[in-house]
Amino acid sequence: MNILFWGTPDYAVPTLMALHQAGHTIVGVVTQPDRRRGRGKTLVPSAVKAKAIKMGLRVFTPERIKQDETCQQQLAELQPDLSVVVAFGQILPKNVLNQPPLGCWNGHGSLLPRWRGAGPIQWSILEGDPETGVGVMAMEEGLDTGPVLIERNLPIGLLDNGHTLAERMSVLTAELMVEAMPLIESAGQGSEPERRARLKVMNQSDRSGDASYARMLTKQDHQIDWSASALNIHRKVMALYPNAVTLWNDKRLKLLHCEPLIDRLREELPAEVHPLIGRWPTGGHPPGTVLESVKGLGVVVSTSGCPILVRAAQLEGKGRSDGDSLIQQLNAAAEQQFGTFS
């Protein structure tokens, strides 16, 4: 089939490649414009644009597709059979959604209707969901409200972070989208209700669970509150990897990997941290207090309940440090305090 592909980050690249390798014709790729990054503020293309150029594909970079009528016309002239959208980053207007005869299909990173919107992967970890998944959804004007054609579940491990989980989900999204293509093609053209009936899509209103929305994360969301529980701090560090931040001696410190020293989670934690579980009494120190630097592992810090082990971090102006290198870099003495943002 002739496919118009919409996507921007690394997450979308496997789907673009898989559709091409499956023999479909990618008539065009729509992605976000180049953005300035790094200290030199150099213009950098999106991951999808970089891959599309290597593949010799035609690329479109509208700043706002809703308002760019010229780009809309150019895309219509490509006459795609359908559009495939994976993490594009803009809401498509109704006329764009209605243009392809076989519809617009989105690869979404959650088990809808849970976690509609931006950042479903991060929110599934933040909220402690035991599993997530990916689905192929028929797009409509509402935010991720369309019916689901097919989906797959994926467990979330205690030590999964936003990056590792996204990598697994991006591969699964690509597999699922390739699987969906012959189903969509076999349903043929016709009105949207007719095609959906032939496809036997699942309306979200008929599915279990209430709808929830993965709102955009704020600067404050990334700041560590040491008065939270060890498990909630751990979830924040893992979900927002590599951007959860605290203060150490008035400098910003990114926390890259932590492990909550909680007995009921023992089986999910590495064996080398098991001797640390239960070593310190709960509530014996103010939250954010350094309890001990443990050789080869990292720094143990108090929380509102059980302590947490900080195993990897990045101090402002420095590179990543783990275990002993982290201990050396922080030079943390017992009873020292991590800071909080006012």
Curated annotation (Swiss-Prot):
EC annotation from Swiss-Prot or TrEMBL: 2.1.2.9
Source organism of the structure: Synechococcus sp. (strain CC9311)
Entry-linked Pfam families: Formyl_trans_C, Formyl_trans_N
This protein's GO CC annotations: cytosol
Superkingdom field: Bacteria
Binding site for (6S)-5,6,7,8-tetrahydrofolate: S110, L111, L112, P113
InterPro entries to which the protein is assigned, alphabetical: Fmt, Formyl_trans_C, Formyl_transf_N, Formyl_transf_N_sf, Formyl_transferase-like_C_sf, Met-tRNA-FMT_C, Met-tRNA-FMT_N
Task performed by this protein: Attaches a formyl group to the free amino group of methionyl-tRNA(fMet). The formyl group appears to play a dual role in the initiator identity of N-formylmethionyl-tRNA by promoting its recognition by IF2 and preventing the misappropriation of this tRNA by the elongation apparatus.
Protein name: Methionyl-tRNA formyltransferase
Catalyzed chemical reaction(s): L-methionyl-tRNA(fMet) + (6R)-10-formyltetrahydrofolate = N-formyl-L-methionyl-tRNA(fMet) + (6S)-5,6,7,8-tetrahydrofolate + H(+)
Keywords: Protein biosynthesis, Transferase
